[in-house]
Regions:
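Active-site microenvironment for binding and transforming phosphate-containing groups
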Residues: 1, 5-141
Length: 141
């Protein structure tokens, strides 16, 4: 049994979220390390917020299919063929359905689109390319 903390970083945009990347990561951690989802502490890092994230009907339909019973929680219908998507909420659902305890999930609530001075945002830059980097490390106690 592994007794030390294993830092894992997993990226999930809208396609990864529809594909339940968080659950797939937990499954791989269980297989490779014997990790139990209930023992995990997870964080949902900076990304675009629901107010800034307008998606087309086909993307919204993919979320409705993947998250039956949760569409009203993660999609706001704009009545113009577009919806506002809550990726933070959708990923929280993925993690809790995979067995992570809700109280062990932290959401940064930092929107990349609202904070272009701090973080790159494809939407805020109107489609210009840029990069974000992330890292995680263990500090010796």
């Amino acid at each position: 049994v592994q007794t030390c903390a294993l830092p894992i970083l997993s990226h999930s945009g809208w396609k990864g979220t529809v594909g339940k990347m968080g659950a797939a990561t937990i499954t791989a951690m269980k297989r490779e390390f014997g990790t139990e989802a209930k023992d995990l502490v997870c964080a949902i890092g900076p990304s675009i917020c629901q107010d800034c994230y307008e998606v087309s009907e086909d993307v919204a339909d993919a979320f409705k299919e993947t998250f039956p019973g949760h569409a009203d929680e993660i999609l706001l219908d704009k009545k113009n063929g577009k919806c506002q998507l809550d990726l933070w909420g959708a990923n929280e659902i993925v993690l809790t359905e995979a067995g992570v305890l809700k109280e062990k999930i932290a959401v940064t609530n930092i929107c990349t689109c609202c904070n272009p001075d701090l973080l790159f945002s494809h939407r805020a830059s109107h489609g210009k390319r840029g990069n974000l980097g992330a890292f995680i490390y263990l500090r010796n106690a």
